[in-house]
Structures are given as C-alpha cells and as structure tokens.
Amino acid sequence: MEKKRYRPNVAAIVLSSNYPKKVEFFIAARSDVPDSWQFPQGGIDKGESPKEALLRELKEEIGTDKIEIIAEFPEWVSYDFPKKIAKKMYPYDGQTQKYFLVKLKPEAKIDLDTKEPEFNDYKFVPYKDLFHYVTFFKRPVYKKVLEYFKKEGYF
C-alpha cells in the first residue's frame, strides 16, 4: 500500500480581542465551497518556520497579522481530504497541521478583501456554536485541539 502524503500546514484558532473576558472564536466561510466554515490555515513554505507561516497566512487570508500567540498545540495533527477535495489537492492525501491559539490585538482589523480572497464572510462564535458551522471533515481535529486548550485552562 502506498504511503499517504500530507501537506505541512499551520492553523490558527483566533480569539477576539475581548479574550479572556469573552471567549469568541473567529471562523470564516470559504469562497470556493458553499457553507464551509473553518479556522484560517495554510501551507508552510520551504525554509519557513511554523510561526513565520502563521503570520504570513493570517495576513494573506484575513488581512492582519496583529496577533498575540497564546499557546501552541504540542504535536502535529493530520487529516485526510474527502475524495472530492483530494483530486484538487493532488499529490497530497491530506494535511498535517501545527495549531496555534492566538488572540487578535485591539488594533487588528479583519479584511477579507485580500490579494487572493479565500473567504467571503466571517464571524466570532462561542464554543457551543462552533461545530454547528465547521465543515464536517475538520471537526475531529478541531475537537482534539480545542479540548487540549480547554483542558490546559485557556478557555
């Protein structure tokens, strides 16, 4: 059996600037997939550290890198693409991700009208509503990572 290939990637669990008073998670709707909400994420370029990729991806996807890194998930987490998406993402079968828990700085301004827009809408939602929006194949990874940060006392 052929070994699966995973694309190295970073993902940001973005909390509003109201954190820790109010715990609200930033999620965005993909412009290319209707009703598909997710956290900002993106590939790690050759020679780039995960933290450098995190800042670059946030700037590219949500128009700001004005964040404070609160914590980092201690391991890399992988998931497989659904068949429909896998064809588009060839040669990769899925992604292996490094997750960061970050807080927007008060001066941060979200702007989805970026050079290559990936999202067409965003909202801040409480934890209890998060999985109502998140696309199905990302839910297990999101649950694992969020449960860890919850257990560690971040929210």
From Swiss-Prot:
SUPFAM superfamilies in the record: Nudix
Transmembrane parts of this sequence: none
Chain ranges for the short sequence motif Nudix box as given in the UniProt record: 42-63
Cofactor(s) essential for the protein: a divalent metal cation
Record key words, sorted: Hydrolase
Biological process (GO), any one: ribose phosphate metabolic process
EC number: 3.6.1.-
Coiled-coil zones: none
Classification via Gene3D superfamilies: Nucleoside Triphosphate Pyrophosphohydrolase
Record domain Nudix hydrolase: where: 5-147
Signal peptide: none
Annotated function: Accelerates the degradation of transcripts by removing pyrophosphate from the 5'-end of triphosphorylated RNA, leading to a more labile monophosphorylated state that can stimulate subsequent ribonuclease cleavage.
HAMAP family in alphabetical order: Nudix_RppH
Protein name, UniProt field: RNA pyrophosphohydrolase
Organism lineage string: Bacteria, Pseudomonadati, Campylobacterota, Epsilonproteobacteria, Nautiliales
Gene: rppH
